[in-house]
């Protein structure tokens, strides 16, 4: 369930807008999406894990806020990110 350093590095490289970019909304949303997918799988196996479910809800909320920010500031970057990640917004 933890994010391996190598996986994190690959996600950052793939979604970075320039070299050394780790804080752009695209990178943050991509990392959150990976964590959300892993936590969703965990919760399918462990449906009574209420504490992890709360963490999942917080991550989804944070991702939604970042996506709303990106949609406001740069709609074209928002659309490409949604398509690349396969999110249904």
Curated annotation (Swiss-Prot):
Residues passing through the membrane, by range: none
Gene Ontology molecular-function annotations: rRNA binding; structural constituent of ribosome
Leader sequence residues: none
InterPro entries found in the cross-reference section: Ribosomal_uS15 (IPR000589), Ribosomal_uS15_bac-type (IPR005290), uS15_NS1_RNA-bd_sf (IPR009068)
Cellular compartments per GO CC: cytosolic small ribosomal subunit
Keywords per UniProt: Ribonucleoprotein, Ribosomal protein, RNA-binding, rRNA-binding
Gene Ontology BP terms: translation
Top-level taxon of the source organism: Bacteria
Pfam families: Ribosomal_S15 (PF00312)
Function: One of the primary rRNA binding proteins, it binds directly to 16S rRNA where it helps nucleate assembly of the platform of the 30S subunit by binding and bridging several RNA helices of the 16S rRNA. Forms an intersubunit bridge (bridge B4) with the 23S rRNA of the 50S subunit in the ribosome.
Subunit structure of this chain's protein: Part of the 30S ribosomal subunit. Forms a bridge to the 50S subunit in the 70S ribosome, contacting the 23S rRNA.
Family label: Belongs to the universal ribosomal protein uS15 family.
UniProt-recorded name of the protein: Small ribosomal subunit protein uS15
Gene assigned in the entry: rpsO
């Amino acid at each position: 369930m933890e994010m391996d350093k190598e996986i994190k590095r690959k996600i950052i490289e793939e979604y970075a807008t320039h070299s050394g970019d780790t804080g752009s909304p695209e990178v943050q949303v991509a990392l959150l999406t990976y964590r959300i997918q892993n936590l969703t799988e965990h919760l399918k196996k462990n449906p009574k894990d209420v504490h992890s479910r709360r963490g999942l809800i917080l991550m989804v909320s944070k991702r939604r806020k970042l996506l709303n920010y990106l949609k406001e500031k740069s709609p074209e970057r928002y659309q490409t990110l949604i398509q690349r990640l396969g999110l249904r917004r």
